[in-house]
Design a protein with these regions (language model features):
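Histidine-centered active-site microenvironments of extracellular/periplasmic hydrolases
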Residues: 421-526, 579, 584-595, 615-616, ...
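His/Asp/Glu-rich, glycine-adjacent segments
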Residues: 131-133, 214-382, 487-496, 522-541, ...
Length: 622
């Protein structure tokens, strides 16, 4: 009975529709192979066309069945079976029909390989986002191994973080019909949309440390300089992230009770972590097994490859369209960025969803996952540009799949969708003023002073580096050993470093103070941090005016700077703008309030940042 039910579920109308489409395209593909391969020859087209139709029909029928049968095995088994099958039917066709001639081992082998590639592309493309396909090849595979539901009396929680998504953008996306799953949850009353305001440093490290550990004290920006040790701390460098978590955690984080951390910056003290920046240094081999389980499934493998390639095509089209219409502001999107984008929007998303579905069928009590794709695309395309909204639409579709899996899992689950921070649309400081903040500071001090700066690399590079670092640490897998050999020149202290931050890691072997840099300028989103390294303590407003008399007046009068914060020996912390000063200690305002166009909470944010041990000598706000 079970076999009969499985057969009836497999051979559906959708299956037969796909077979017909594949058949037609197989004919075109085989005709193409006959045209380009010298060993495949058609002597009489009147009769050979029927042979070609037969070969194509056999492929169209057998291939979906092979995918179904080989799901429990590996991609290698799947490829070998299809190569042997295609080679056999090409040879057999030549024996049966003299008008279809296949001469020589290589012509048969290349023909078989060509058919296999064509089949893989067709099957992957046609099943790429079919609900039925995903259900059968992913959800049902987990469902067959799910835990005993009798064990779980309390519901679990899945925390789904969309990196960099602001409340207004989310509302607009829902109103435009781009996020129907979230709209349905809101309309049903199961969810509410609540807006919150993040800290002064609007970035993942500060927000996620607070969410997962209840503490984000002394994270002044995405990257900052520490005078006590002469080191630049970068939030998404694994060894720095581990150190930050050690400072933040009291051992009782959000996920401490048998929870799971998936693709986050911090662990939330979860006992089960995968692809989490702060724990990469202590990984064991078990953590990479899920990756292998994902890729040995032929459906997952074909789906990932085709989605990845298609996203690169979408990115190239979006970049071309921006240039064609002269859409501004825009940033450079060449080089490795299309691959980096596909890695964050497709590769990490697909792995994260796969891991969460597996977690739910195991019945884990809680899991927290960060989806970084929207943030990466929004930084390059714009926060509400079509391709950024498209990332949200596709992510919403994945949330529906999680919901479907939860309905079949052994434990009931609640979904909490949240964001760590938002972002605003605008040109960069460099685009507007033809100089970086570091160059601006350099012009305001004497030439004898050395100025050090560090590029703010895309967070996507950090995600890619973290994944490669985790993957290569598996001593048992040959693929990991090969990867270690390939990227050894870009590996430092056991961590992979690709992208612009490679230069920072080279420099990081020597503390900044030993390289005679007297001024360190670090950009971080809307903030700029200026440190004077000849002083071990925080330099006061009065001493800055005494030693660098042009810096403060020059910064506050610059059209690209909203205000700066410094600490006065006499008046305490002050926010200084072009036309006035806000004395943060007592709330007094002299002249025009530089904070009037910002949140009403801005003074409180600044007062708190002023208490950080590693707050800069001058905090610059755009």
């Amino acid at each position: 009975m079970r076999l009969r039910r499985e057969i009836s579920e497999f051979f559906t109308l959708a299956w037969f529709t796909r077979v017909l489409i594949i058949w037609a395209l197989e004919v075109a593909g085989l005709l193409f192979l006959v045209a380009i391969l010298p060993g495949l020859t058609v002597i009489n087209w009147d009769t050979a066309i029927w042979t070609i139709l037969l070969i194509s029909l056999l492929n169209a029928l057998i291939w979906p069945t092979l995918v179904y049968l080989t799901v429990p095995f590996t991609v290698l088994t799947f490829i070998l079976l299809t190569l042997v099958f295609n080679g056999f039917i090409i040879w057999l066709s030549g024996q049966i029909d003299p008008s279809f001639e296949s001469i020589g081992y290589w012509s048969i082998s290349l023909g078989a390989l060509g058919l296999t590639v064509i089949n893989a592309l067709l099957i992957g493309f046609l099943a790429i986002d079919f609900h039925e396909s995903y259900h059968r090849y992913v959800i049902q595979q987990f469902s067959s191994k799910k835990a005993n539901s009798a064990k779980f009396n309390t519901p679990g929680v899945m925390f789904l973080e969309i990196d960099g998504l602001s409340a207004p953008v989310l509302r607009n996306a829902i109103e435009m019909g781009q996020m129907p799953t979230l709209a349905r949850w809101l309309n049903s009353g199961s969810h509410r949309l609540i807006e919150w305001e993040c800290d002064l440093s609007s970035q993942t490290a500060a927000s996620q440390a607070g969410i997962l550990h209840g503490n984000n004290f002394d994270i002044p920006a995405f990257r900052w300089y520490e005078k006590d040790n002469g080191k630049i701390m970068v939030s998404n460098h694994p060894r720095h992230t581990a150190e930050i978590e050690q400072r933040m955690s009291n051992g009782n984080g959000l996920l401490v009770n048998e929870g799971a951390s998936r693709g986050n910056m911090f662990s939330g003290d979860a006992p089960d972590v995968m692809f989490t920046f702060s724990t990469l240094a202590g990984l064991s081999n078990v953590h990479t097994k899920t990756y292998y389980h994902y890729f040995i499934n032929p459906y997952n493998f074909a789906r990932m490859i085709e989605l990845f390639i298609w996203d690169i095509v979408l990115e190239k089209y979006a970049a071309w369209k921006q240039k064609l219409t002269d859409e501004r502001p825009r940033v450079r999107r060449r080089g490795a960025y299309p691959i980096l984008r596909a890695f964050t929007t497709i590769f990490l998303r697909e792995l994260s969803i796969y891991m969460l579905i597996g977690d739910m069928f195991k019945g884990i009590p809680s899991a927290y996952t960060t989806f970084v794709g929207y943030d990466e695309v929004a930084h390059h395309s714009g926060i509400e540009r079509p391709d950024a909204i498209d990332v949200l639409r596709k992510l919403d579709h994945q949330f529906a799949r999680l919901e479907e899996a939860a309905n079949q899992s052994p434990r009931r689950y609640h979904f909490v969708v949240l964001s760590d921070h938002g972002q605003s649309q605008g040109a960069t400081f460099l685009q507007r003023h033809n100089m970086t903040l570091a160059e601006c500071v350099r012009r305001l001090i004497s030439e004898e002073h050395a100025v050090e700066s560090a590029e703010h690399a895309s967070e996507g590079w950090g995600s890619l580096n973290a994944f490669l670092t985790e993957f290569m640490k598996d001593e048992e897998r040959r693929a990991s050993r090969i990867l270690r050999g390939i990227i050894k020149p870009r590996t430092y202290s056991g961590n992979v470093v690709l992208g612009p931050d490679h230069r920072h890691y080279v420099h990081d072997k020597k503390p900044i103070e030993k390289r005679a840099a007297e001024v360190v300028v670090l950009p971080s989103g809307n903030l700029g941090l200026v440190y004077f390294t000849d002083w071990k303590e925080r330099l006061s407003y009065e001493k800055i005016r005494e030693n660098f008399p042009n810096v403060i007046p020059g910064l506050v009068q610059h059209p690209g700077i909203g205000f700066i914060m410094v600490r006065s020996e006499e008046n305490g912390p002050m926010a200084i703008g072009a036309k006035g000063t806000h004395f943060l200690e007592n709330g007094m305002i002299e002249g025009e309030d530089p904070l009037k166009n910002f949140s009403s909470n801005a003074p409180e944010h600044l007062r708190r940042s002023d208490t950080f041990p590693h707050v800069p000598d001058i905090l610059v706000n755009s």
